[in-house]
Every structure is written in structure tokens, then in C-alpha cells.
């Protein structure tokens, strides 16, 4: 994983994913979260808690309906690959990509992920419970 700092809680590697409240409700009913990216590019975008502000600001600036899913990586049954993000992401940063649906059983907590008054998501927002 090339120097990636992972958020570990009680020997659990924690990854995170953002989705809307409605998408989370659907996932709870079906047992898995299947975002459009799974069909479009073959994987679910994940992040570390330290990275999640980057895609949040790029894709969801100002949105107030986001949920932060904290995921126990050991509970994922599909492969996770660490791959480059998009142009503009810092240097050699790689992101975890889940090559399959995100099982609800792998999600260990769900909290609202709200922006600051200016619509941006600060870098430290997801690193604290």
C-alpha cells in the first residue's frame, strides 16, 4: 500500500464511503450498496478517513444529505485494490476501490457527513467520531 496511513480502531482497518441517505436506506433493504460506479467503472469508490474530504469536496460540495459509512475492511468479500485517484489529488496518493457491492454487514457505523457553512468538507471531519 505504499506508505498509506490507515485508520485502525481496535485492530480493525477502517475504510469509508459516502452515499446519500436515500441510497443508504435502499442498501439496508437490499443488504448491499451498489452505487452507479459499480456498473459504470466496475468498482465502489472508498477512501481512508483522512482522504474522504477530497472526493467529498470534488463531488458533493454543499450537499447536506450525505452519510459517512465506516467500513471494517476485513468484512469485505470482494477485492479491494489501492489505485490512483484523479488528476488533482495529492502526489502519489492512492485510494481503495472495492470491486464488488458493499455489503451492509461490513458497515460498522453510519453518521451524517455535513459540510461547513461555506459548503466545504474539512480534512479532519471524518477522522473523528
Residue ranges and their predicted role:
Residues 2-129:
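Conserved, structured core segments of small domains
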Amino acid at each position: 500500500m505504499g506508505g498509506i496511513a490507515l485508520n485502525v480502531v481496535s485492530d480493525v482497518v477502517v475504510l469509508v464511503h459516502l452515499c446519500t441517505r436515500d441510497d443508504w436506506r435502499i442498501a439496508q433493504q437490499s443488504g448491499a450498496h451498489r452505487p452507479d460506479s459499480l456498473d459504470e467503472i466496475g468498482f465502489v469508490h472508498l477512501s481512508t478517513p483522512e482522504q474522504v474530504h477530497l472526493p467529498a469536496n470534488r463531488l458533493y460540495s454543499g450537499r447536506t444529505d450525505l452519510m459517512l459509512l465506516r467500513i471494517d475492511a476485513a468484512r469485505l468479500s470482494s477485492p479491494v485494490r489501492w489505485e490512483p485517484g484523479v488528476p488533482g489529488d495529492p502526489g502519489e496518493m492512492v485510494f481503495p476501490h472495492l470491486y464488488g457491492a458493499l455489503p451492509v454487514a461490513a458497515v460498522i457505523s453510519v453518521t451524517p457527513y455535513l459540510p461547513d457553512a461555506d459548503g466545504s468538507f474539512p480534512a479532519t471531519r471524518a477522522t473523528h467520531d
